[in-house]
Amino acid sequence: MTAITAFFFLTLPWLNPFSPGPTAAVVPLLFSWVCAALAVLVVVAARAQTTSQTLVRTLALAWLAGASVSALIGLLQYFGGTAWAGPWLNHTSIGEAYGNLRQRNQFATLMNIGLVALLWWTASPPEVYLNKNWPSLPPRMRFFVCVMLAMLISAGNAASSSRTGLVQLGLLSVLTWIWLRPSAGSKGHAWHLRPVAQILLIALLAYAVATAALPLLAGLDPAASGAWARLKSGDTVCSSRLTLWGNVLHLISQKPWLGWGWGELDYAHFVTLYSGERFCDILDNAHNLPLHLAVEFGLPVATLACGTGTWLLWRARPWREPDSTRQMAWGILAMIGLHSLLEYPLWYGPFQIAALAAIWLLQAKKTEKTQPFNAAVLYTKGLVAIFIIALCLVLAWHYQLASQIYLSPENRMAAYQADTQKKIQGIPFFQDQVRFAELTTADLTTENAKAIHALALDMLHFSPEPRVIELILDSARLLGKIDEADFYARRYQAAFPEAYGRWLVTKSGLVNPTSQPGGSISNH
């Protein structure tokens, strides 16, 4: 029962459909950490009855189940079949799929994490997967189930149209080929068994077939759909990663030693005028972990972090790893690591938990005998888990309070339907969201121009979007700060030329901001 309960908590973060504003990532992040802490508490409560192998099995099954169920959701989304589920499934246009993770590359990474776990199950001998808590199947039936799951997960990956997912599949194929070689060793049930190669080959074939078949079945053009089509067509220049990385490298050159500061990339991108092409959106992440560390913390910190990681990787030599459980852990980290070179999965709860779990697997003992827990370590883990749950609940409550101003009055909690802004003014957390709402619901006048101007300048570091910039421009002109208004106007024109043009056309004298904040905050 312990393993089943822990499995439930470890699977849920991948399937959570809810991400209420104003900052969509907050609730999934808190939910993921609460689930992980509850899983730890379940294991702690079981005391010495839980073996390391049981925990490994539970993690692998949770990754596999999360990927399989998400693949089903993704296929429903791809064919427009999610309306019946209401709020319990995210809804997309036909031809799109991202499960309940709300982003195609995150969905594709989950598919490949699930495939890594499936290969581990395929390679594991009966003494690893047979357990009174898990159903057992005859070998042929078990292989058949693995084949079906490989096809399902690969179809989900293909439905995502994620180029990242395609590259990850190639990386996993290379890693598996390395680990299948006799020189990789044979200890610990390594992935040298022929069924592993068969399952991986089936997964690759299923991906290729699904890439061609899914668009046809959905009434779409196969030449314009899928990861291969997106690889061939590429992105527009202003939205490509090459443009983005070029801008980030320029920003690094401006402040190479200490960087721009944590969370300041979006501000840095807005206030900088580039000589070449400009990335045409708010830029709050470098979409490459080493570059992000460099632009926000400086080159010395980035070099130290990346150098340490490279040294640890070289010492561990994962390409020589003979143990299948550690191979699975390295596979999970490889999928997340590759994704981190193109985006920022480690900013999201499910991937944080997966990365930490994979690191734990690398440290776990290879023995399958029951090991009694050290009492001090056991209770320390329990106390840490309780602290995490308590902290997340406190943060969730304050986030709920901060979000009230973003709702229409009738949808707010009863105690916050009137004087909402005043009542949430003093909450200790999520003050950026509260102050952003204060700014965007205020009417600019000569009396409050100074306060609005100061607040807008501050909020520019939180969300440099058109309505914030326009308040800076209007309040600056009211205060007679013409040079400052011109400074930000040039940057507004460079960053958001269409919005700037509309602002020029519509403004006559002062332009008041909207009376209600939006339901979400751009890129936050």
Can you name each region flagged by the protein language model?
Residues 92-108, 233-242, 283-296:
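Short aromatic-rich membrane-water interface segments that cap or initiate transmembrane helices
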